[in-house]
């Protein structure tokens, strides 16, 4: 794809391709619209057609992250916005497929406590919406939470999972999947090979929150075996967990309560999002 200077999406929009932002399983390019300024304000994610995660992500954007559905959902609840990107284009070549979203800024790195509290509320709102549509995100980690102009965006929907089987019954807990993702933020269920459920998304968000509030994850730089062992042990001894995350004893009580509530959720249980959200709403 490096040899291409531009390409057209399925609606005929022309996208001029700039520098590579990231190269891994998929490739991210800076892109801009034709006949606009010289600034590359968009990002194109591209991969080979045989790569199923990108296809799944495109389908998720189309079928679940519908702007009208999001608008209705937020208006009914009096929510300003959800941390969900808008989709600006989808396309394919003979061998590749791609989609285009706005350049959503940098990884969220809060500078004050107020911004952390706001981020916690926004992310709980966003996960509640995704869960209400019958899916989990499955890959909550800091690098997937971006900020631009004080607005958060949750990206990377390549590992979403359906919550329900036919007949609207919750998926069963089975440890039969190959795990993938950043082991530092992975939920215990995913470590063990189970599909990420609602509690898993919220658990992963909790690990992000710990770092946002200035704590450290005690299993950083450990092997995957040691990481899962520590996480399972810490779930039994939450006080010890926070002593190790915040050695100076400055852990926020709101965060401690959040982790306590999330750790007690059953695999198929519907979380009390309002209770979790209220922990971080400041008067």
Curated annotation (Swiss-Prot):
Superkingdom: Viruses
InterPro entries, sorted: CK1_Ser-Thr_kinase, Kinase-like_dom_sf, Prot_kinase_dom, Ser-Thr/Tyr_kinase_cat_dom
SUPFAM superfamilies attached to this UniProt entry: Protein kinase-like (PK-like)
Means of activity regulation: Both catalytically active kinases B1/VPK1 and host VRK2 repress B12 inhibitory activity in a B1/VPK1 deletion mutant strain.
GO molecular function list: ATP binding; protein serine/threonine kinase activity
Limits of the Protein kinase domain: 1-283
Alphabetical list of PROSITE patterns matching this protein: PROTEIN_KINASE_DOM
Localisation per UniProt entry: Host nucleus
Record-given protein name: Pseudokinase OPG198
Organism (species): Vaccinia virus (strain Western Reserve)
Gene: OPG198
């Amino acid at each position: 794809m490096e040899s291409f200077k531009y390409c057209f999406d399925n609606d005929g929009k022309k996208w001029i391709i700039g520098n590579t932002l990231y190269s891994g399983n998929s490739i991210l390019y800076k892109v801009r619209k034709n006949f606009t300024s010289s600034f590359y304000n968009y990002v194109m994610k591209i991969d080979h057609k045989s790569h199923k995660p990108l296809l799944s992500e495109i389908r998720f954007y189309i079928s679940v992250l519908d702007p009208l559905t999001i608008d209705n959902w937020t208006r009914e609840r009096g929510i300003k916005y959800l941390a969900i990107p808008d989709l600006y284009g989808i396309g394919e070549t003979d061998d590749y497929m791609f989609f285009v979203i706005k350049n959503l800024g940098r990884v969220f790195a809060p500078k004050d406590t107020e911004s952390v509290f706001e981020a916690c509320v926004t992310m709980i709102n966003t996960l509640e919406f995704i869960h209400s549509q019958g899916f989990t995100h499955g890959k909550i980690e800091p690098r997937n939470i971006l900020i631009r102009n004080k607005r958060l965006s949750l990206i990377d929907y390549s590992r979403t999972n359906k919550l329900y089987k036919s007949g609207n019954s919750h998926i069963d807990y089975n440890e039969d999947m190959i795990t993938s993702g950043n082991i530092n933020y992975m939920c215990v269920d995913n470590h063990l090979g189970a599909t990420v459920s609602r509690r898993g998304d919220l658990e992963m968000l909790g690990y992000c929150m710990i770092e946002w509030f200035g704590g450290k994850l005690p299993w950083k730089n450990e092997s995957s075996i040691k990481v899962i062992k520590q996480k399972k042990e810490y779930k039994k001894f939450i006080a010890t967990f926070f002593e190790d995350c915040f050695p100076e004893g400055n852990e926020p009580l709101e965060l401690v309560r959040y982790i306590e509530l999330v750790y007690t959720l059953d695999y198929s249980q519907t979380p009390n999002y309002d209770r979790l959200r209220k922990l971080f709403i400041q008067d």
